[in-house]
Amino acid sequence: MSQFKSKEEAAESGVYIRKIQSFVKREGRLTKGQEKAIESNWETMGLEHKSGLLDMNEVFGRTAPVVLEIGFGMGKSLVTMAKNEPDKDFIGIEVHRPGIGACLADAQEQGVTNLRVYEHDAVEVLADCIADGSLSRMQLFFPDPWHKKRHHKRRIVQPEFVEKLRGKLAIGGVFHMATDWENYAEHMLEIMAVAPGYKNLSSTSDYVPRPEQRPLTKFEQRGHRLGHGVWDLMFERVA
């Protein structure tokens, strides 16, 4: 790629540069309930990457702080947070269709209306659809740890990613991460400690106790019983 200044420039010359992805798309089968939830709710709750830059006020029909979560899994925690914080608007991004269906089914059942979802690559959504300075909180909970050393480059938390994310957060906005993989927690801390424009909200300059706003998952509860740790990190955009 050295002869090109960007992937876009390479593409214009007919050269394709393979992008390192932080996820592996595992398609799993949709249940009938998940399929029905997508059919019933996508028109009102689904967002399309191809539509480009979002007008948050138009999407949600009001002006409110916006929280974005990358990789919400089956969506239980995201729906719970949206229900518990009705004064905020939530956007979730997930690449696995069964998770999209489960999230929409749960949102419908809970009567949650302040939630929208993308079925797309989060890095592309951030770049093309989220306006600079528009997010009050960014959430990344239990991302794939890519625990083998040779795969660490696939971890989503990298200097380039957190710098791009900083531009999307409002001044005073918070990037909240959580992982149950200690080595990844250390990796996150190492990256964020030197990332410009961020301030660690930990009084000990490392991790924070789980904030009340992040629901305790069944997976975590089981982990606690087995003595497994979970690490939360919160960094505020200050510049």
From Swiss-Prot:
Residues that, per the record, bind substrate: K148, D180, T217, K218, F219, E220
Group of enzyme by EC: transferase
Listed GO CC annotations: tRNA methyltransferase complex
Entry EC number(s): 2.1.1.33
Pathway assignment: tRNA modification; N(7)-methylguanine-tRNA biosynthesis
Residues at the catalytic site: D144
SUPFAM superfamilies: S-adenosyl-L-methionine-dependent methyltransferases
MF GO annotations: tRNA (guanine(46)-N7)-methyltransferase activity
Matching InterPro entries: SAM-dependent_MTases_sf, tRNA_(Gua-N-7)_MeTrfase_Trmb, tRNA_methyltr_TrmB_bact
Key words of the record: Methyltransferase, S-adenosyl-L-methionine, Transferase, tRNA processing
Pfam family, one: Methyltransf_4
UniProt binding sites for S-adenosyl-L-methionine: E69, E94, D121, D144
Catalytic activity: guanosine(46) in tRNA + S-adenosyl-L-methionine = N(7)-methylguanosine(46) in tRNA + S-adenosyl-L-homocysteine
Residue ranges that the Swiss-Prot or TrEMBL entry lists as coiled coil: none
HAMAP family reported for this sequence: tRNA_methyltr_TrmB
Entry function: Catalyzes the formation of N(7)-methylguanine at position 46 (m7G46) in tRNA.
Similarity annotation: Belongs to the class I-like SAM-binding methyltransferase superfamily. TrmB family.
NCBIfam families in UniProt: tRNA (guanosine(46)-N7)-methyltransferase TrmB
Name listed for the protein in its UniProt record: tRNA (guanine-N(7)-)-methyltransferase
Organism: Pseudoalteromonas atlantica (strain T6c / ATCC BAA-1087)
